Amino acid sequence: MTQSEPVVEIVTEADAWQPDPRWRPAARLTVLLGEDDHWQRRPRYHEIVRRARDAGLAGASVWRGMEGYGVTSRIHTTRLLDLAENLPIMVMIVDDAELLREFVSGNAELFDTGTVALSAVQVWSSGAGSRP
């Protein structure tokens, strides 16, 4: 008669995680601009936010950076008064990936400068005020 060896199950933290239905897949559109980027004499970031709202996207936010550089490799910073110009601007919009792709395609003239990135994210939906 042979003795069977005990079965040992190794469970890692990742394996033990149970999906929470309040998390749902979404996408994040990130647009990196310079503060001096304009669209028809208005800040380009303002026009992007206005059109995102008009398109019914879930929400948009704009951040002004402290320091950064772009394609010209010139550093723009708030640390020195004489260089505190054309600071980096980041526009972020989170919604369904296909809606964001359609938004960029339908407003391509707004995205001819800067960097546009689309990333997969998870959005917490607590229920109150959440989109379906």
Language-model-detected regions and their locations in the chain:
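Positively charged, small/polar-rich N-terminal and surface patches that mediate targeting and assembly
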Residues: 1-132
